[in-house]
């Protein structure tokens, strides 16, 4: 299956608990942390929820 690289660009401090949990679900912990994930609708939905804190590095 295709993969997607996601990078955390902003801190989770002071964010909604749901958004913090979404970052944890994506496996992101710190600013500039990059994870390679499977490109599924569930992962895309999680990225859309926290789009202001992450960026897609590579598809």
Curated annotation (Swiss-Prot):
Organism domain of life: Bacteria
GO cellular component, one term: cytosolic large ribosomal subunit
GO biological process: translation
Keyword flag Ribosomal protein: yes
Gene3D superfamilies to which the protein is assigned, alphabetical: Ribosomal protein L30, ferredoxin-like fold domain
Residue ranges the record marks as coiled coil: none
GO MF entries: structural constituent of ribosome
Keywords linked to the UniProt accession: Ribonucleoprotein, Ribosomal protein
InterPro entries in the cross-refs: Ribo_uL30_ferredoxin-like_sf, Ribosomal_uL30_bac-type, Ribosomal_uL30_CS, Ribosomal_uL30_ferredoxin-like
Family indicated by similarity: Belongs to the universal ribosomal protein uL30 family.
Subunit: Part of the 50S ribosomal subunit.
Protein's recorded name: Large ribosomal subunit protein uL30
Organism, as annotated: Alteromonas mediterranea (strain DSM 17117 / CIP 110805 / LMG 28347 / Deep ecotype)
